[in-house]
Amino acid sequence: MTATTPSDKDRVIIFDTTLRDGEQCPGATMTFEEKLEVASLLDAMGVDVIEAGFPIASDGDFAAVHEIAKRAKNAVICGLSRAGAKDIDRCAEAIRPAKQGRIHTFLSTSPVHMKYKLQMDAEQVYQLVISAVTRARNHTDNVEWSSEDGTRTEFDFLCKCVEAAIKAGATTINIPDTVGYSVPEEYFDLFKRVRENVPNSDKAIFSVHCHDDLGMAVANSLAGIRGGARQIECTVNGIGERAGNTALEEVVMAMRVRNDKLPFWNKIDTTMLTRASKVVSAATSFPVQYNKAIVGRNAFAHESGIHQDGMLKNAETYEIMRPESVGVKQTSLVMGKHSGRHAFVHKLEEMGYKLGQNQLEDAFVRFKALADRKKEIYDEDIEALVDQEIAQSHDRIKLLSLTVIAGTHGPQRATMKLDVEGQTRIEEAEGNGPVDAVFNCIKALVPHVAKLELYQVHAVTQGTDAQAEVSVRLAHEGRSMTARAADPDTLVASAKAYLSALNKIVMKRERDLPVPEAAAS
């Protein structure tokens, strides 16, 4: 609990939709194993409701929701469903193994959505709300209904639909700011007025779901809570469609740090926030911006001499929260080529990593090799090394060796050796530059039609011996897969990043059926 005087009426339910709305962010697709890892972490850190996916979207999504439902120890496991009978029944089947399951069904209610998206009139939508909630309630007594594009819905019609949904059995009512259009005062007033005008509003918990198109998702969510909502729908790192969703770590810490103005509490173990951020970043290959609130690299960094002087005298001069409260450690070992296995294991534990014995041995070997090539090893170096080790443990295609010949004369040439599902393949290729030669080698060794959409390089740390971190995004059959890799050799990092994205495509293609129209609530 994070409030000083907790009571049930002040408790805010944290509903995490990283695995559903977060994954709808272009390029943020996660593998089956990555989803299980994220769900396990969310469950352990005290998330109340985990929206694990959209079961009817694909066999892969269904399997992930079903497996997460079986494994969850504490959280309610929720699946998203449109208003159709097949969607609802498929969702019910996916969450059936859960100790606590929820069906989240949604339907657009705004004039623009009803006219152009649904091509239905208000009465048809109203009747569909009733039938959808009724069908969902036949499967479970924990049903959430969302009025998609609720902030642009006519007020009287919104109240009518909310009242009908509660009467049909909905226990949670979500009024989302689907397109990030609202402002805090308006969102506060909307919840206050709906609760005052819907006769049976006391029979359901109201929920906020905000997008960050105007940069106000967190502010709007907190305004909705002040207006009477008691559930916040959010994602780790704020990932999500377009500009993203409300960031879990930001709303949780806002309620904790400013409990004087936001007298609410939740069950989140805030010391796990930084670890959750890193796990989601690694799984999605979406780097966290350095100045991101709460979990960014610079969130607790002070470079100005004046600030440093103040911090040394009293940390409260420039810090409104202790870094330990969100899982950031102030003290650390200086890692280098003389560090032994014990020190390496201690550093990993300090950073929040728990590796199996084989992964640990492989990571240590790579660490020693890196330490021989760098004067100093930073935490970011180890983070990149270990995250890459975890990602590669499920790879079908692995880089064994790479040699590149480049210079001022003639085409550049690359020779590469790959392990492709246990078979060793060797190829040589030329290109217009060394990177082009490397990628041409991969195409020759593993023929594919994926198109390169993004290639970016930046240094993980300072210095001429810094590791290069390469980001690659490949487009394949209407989907984009993004991957990152780090290595002191930029060309090796490029090859590893390309192969990592290719591995994601291979695994996704094997698991999924064609995806229907994406949901957005």
From Swiss-Prot:
Binding site for Mn(2+): 21, 209, 211, 245
PROSITE patterns: AIPM_HOMOCIT_SYNTH_1 (PS00815), AIPM_HOMOCIT_SYNTH_2 (PS00816), PYR_CT (PS50991)
GO cellular component, one term: cytosol
Name under which the protein is recorded: 2-isopropylmalate synthase
Keywords assigned by UniProt, alphabetized: Amino-acid biosynthesis, Branched-chain amino acid biosynthesis, Cytoplasm, Leucine biosynthesis, Manganese, Metal-binding, Transferase
Residue stretches spanning the membrane: none
Positions of the UniProt region annotated as Regulatory domain: 398-521
CDD domains noted in UniProt: DRE_TIM_IPMS (cd07940)
Pfam families from the UniProt entry: HCS_D2, HMGL-like, LeuA_dimer
Domain Pyruvate carboxyltransferase as annotated: residue spans: 12-274
Signal peptide: none
Biological or metabolic pathway of the protein: Amino-acid biosynthesis; L-leucine biosynthesis; L-leucine from 3-methyl-2-oxobutanoate: step 1/4
Subcellular localization: Cytoplasm
The keyword Ribonucleoprotein appears for this protein: no
Chief localization: cytoplasm
MF (Gene Ontology): 2-isopropylmalate synthase activity; acetyl-CoA C-acetyltransferase activity; manganese ion binding
Function, in words: Catalyzes the condensation of the acetyl group of acetyl-CoA with 3-methyl-2-oxobutanoate (2-ketoisovalerate) to form 3-carboxy-3-hydroxy-4-methylpentanoate (2-isopropylmalate).
